[in-house]
Structure formats: structure tokens, C-alpha cells
């Protein structure tokens, strides 16, 4: 629903009061005087559309409901064993009888088991052992099984380490729900050298550029900023998540639940130390922002001072924790669905099926019935049917 200007101003005032924010504080954050804001709220002054959007955007930063959430977004662990059944049953605590087995793998592994987007690779090579890989969807699906097992990520990671698991990659994703970060602004600060970090390397890509060949969802990602070398064991990826939701799902940008995403990508020893820190303090915010603060900070230029003494940028200071609600590790359990298959059918197959149905109806033919009768289900299809029709509680080991 599109609000008119009067409704926007009424909503602005109501939210400001509900958040406990004074006119002066919001005015300063928005770059105007308190008197000017007072005239806007009382209807004596008509703001520009741009100013009204700025006021709403700045007010969103003061939302007492956590403006930031954090999730695991990628987990890759190698186990020094060839006993894949042990890893599935005792570490993942999943029922192997419901897993799809296929005689091929990635990363030079020769076979794998899968349950939705949860992949476990193995081979006859003892040095390679067993490899668990959970990408974004895999993490969300695994959380639904952790929930059924009454376990947490902390419990699982502890079990993995105790069993000798070697952390190969861990990604922590910080979701910005209110637009605290401004990616083009951060990119401009990198260009102007208002960016202090262990690595000066950065890359900024506009939406739609031929970019990010390593990214699975590269065609969906909006404007994207990489901080640090992509070859290093620590780097950051910041991108417009609302654009991704718009391209993937058609969600209007103004209705997107997540505006930006800040991903901390850790490999090998860096991933291990992050997990160790998580399991020592059980404080995901401390772990995440200690890594960020160690590697990067954005500042505002002060010509009369040394660069290391430049003032921390206000927006960046807010993001890393100044005067905002604390951040906790959250979960977003999602069941394994046929979303990608259904999207493919809808895009590639449905128009042809609809055409055949209309031809059958008009000519009295039975093309559709014949096609369905002749279709043969493979063992893979049968296992997917089994996975899709079994409740989560039956897919886990008790």
C-alpha cells in the first residue's frame, strides 16, 4: 500500500514517539534542525519526498526491535574418518535411510549423501575424509533438524570439534533490516581512502555486472562491496539483499525484510578460531564484531589529523554497536522444499503443459494422460518423494 504524504508524516511522528526518540535526536541524525522537524510534524512545512524518505530511514535505525540479526550462512567441516555413517548418525544426528546417495561428488570426492541442501561427501582417500557442506539453504534446513533434535548450533559445533572436525569455512551473515549500512557510501569511502584495515584491497560492483564468479546467487545480488582479498582466509562481502529478494521472488524493495547483508567469510585457521571463540563465550556478537573491528573500520576525513586518528564514521559506529540493541545469533529454520524445482517447472514447463491441456480439451486427445502414464520415476525421484512426505522428527536420530 502506498501512503500519501500526510499518512507518512503521521506514521513518522507515531513511530518516533513509540521508539522514545526526541525531535532533536531525529533531526540531528537527518541533517536538519529540530525546529524544521517540528514544523513538518505539525503540518506547517511540506518536506520534499527525499527528506521524508531520509527521516523514515534514519528513524528506522532507532527501532528498539533488533535492527540487525545474525545467522550461520555457510558451514564446511572436514572429518578425519571414512566412516560416513558415523558422521551422519552421531554428529549430524540424521537418519541415513532418508538420505539420497549418488556416485559423484565435488572437490574431488567420489560420492555423496544428501538431504535437500545438506551435503556430505566421501571417497576412498583417507586423507580427504568426510566433508560436510551447508550453504545458505542447507544451514536453514539443518536448523529445522537441530530444532527437532533439541540442539543448538553451539551443541553441533562442539560435537564436531570433539570428533576431530576441521573447520574449512564458516560464514556469519549479519542481516541489516533497516538500512543502517549504505553500500555505495562505503564504496565511496574506500575510493577516498576513508577506510582503515589490514588489507587495502576492495572491489565494488553495480547490480547486474558480470561479477562474483564464485557466488552461487551472483545473478540475484544487488550492489556488492568486497573488503579484503578474496584469496585470503578472512574477507567481507556486503550486498543488497532486498535486490536479491526482488529479483528472486518479486518482493517490492520497500517491502523486503532484509535490506543489506554483511557476510564475514572465514576459512581454515580463521574459521577454527571463530568457532572456538563462539564456544568459549557463547556471544555471537562479540565474536563477529571483534573480527570486523580487527580487520576494518570506516572513518571521516579530518585533514589536520593523522589518518589513524580520524573520527569513526557515525553510520559505521552504529553498525558495530554504538547505541544500538545487542545482537544475538538467531536461527530461521526452513524445511527442505521443492522451491527451485517448482520455479523451474513454472518457468520452463508450465506453459507447455498448459498448451497441451488446451489442445486435449479442444481436440478430445489425451496427450497429458499418456505422458504421465509413460513417465518413469528413478530411485532419486522415489527418495525425494520419501524425504518430502516424512516429518522432520522422523528424519533425525533420537
Enumerate the language-model features and the residues they cover.
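Positions in alpha-helical segments
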Residues: 10, 14, 35-38
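Short, basic-rich loop-to-helix N-cap that marks the start of a DNA-contacting helix
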Residues: 43-57
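Structured, helix-rich domain cores that form ligand/interaction pockets
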Residues: 2-7, 14, 18, 57-336, ...
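Residues in the recognition helix of alpha-helical DNA-binding motifs
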Residues: 15, 29, 40, 341, ...
